[in-house]
Regions:
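Membrane-interface extramembranous regions
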Residues: 2-148
Length: 148
């Protein structure tokens, strides 16, 4: 006997949902820069690669898992990755060393930042919408209704 499994629109894993391509691009670019940092060797680059990998995994979990706790804090990986990539870019500009692969990694990180801003506008409508959801998730306001 075969059982047919169908997904409804409110379950995770539906690849037709809006924004899946955007999330996929963010995750792919994040894993790419993680790989670049991992191949450079040294503890600092290795830890940077681990951080990027963890944030990529968090983005996937938020995109796929419809658990209420995950959805309550779905803003956290976006802000975390935004801050992490920004800090990595700033540290590179201050410390160096400047070489071609480093600039490639920074270009990828700028692309990550750009896609994250687009994702924040897609999901929350504006940075203010993200702030409202973040505050509401810790009990300091009312969460806005979203269709995505």
């Amino acid at each position: 006997m075969e059982l047919a499994v169908t997904r409804t629109s409110n379950q995770g894993g539906d690849l037709r949902r809006p924004g899946r391509g955007l999330t996929l691009a963010i995750v792919e670019l994040t894993l790419t820069t993680a790989y670049i940092h991992l191949t450079l060797g040294g503890i600092l680059f290795t830890l940077n690669a681990v951080g990027y990998s963890a944030l990529a995994a968090a983005m996937v979990i938020v995109a796929v898992d419809r658990h209420p706790l995950v959805q309550r804090f779905d803003w956290l990986p976006r802000i975390g990755l935004l801050a992490y990539a920004s800090t990595t870019i700033a540290a590179y500009l201050v410390v160096g060393p400047y070489f071609s692969l480093g600039w490639v990694a920074k270009a990828i990180e700028v692309a990550i930042l750009t896609l994250l801003v687009a994702d924040i506008h897609r999901v929350y409508g504006s940075p203010g919408g993200l702030l409202r959801d973040a505050l509401a998730s810790v009990g300091l306001g009312k969460r806005q209704m979203r269709t995505a």
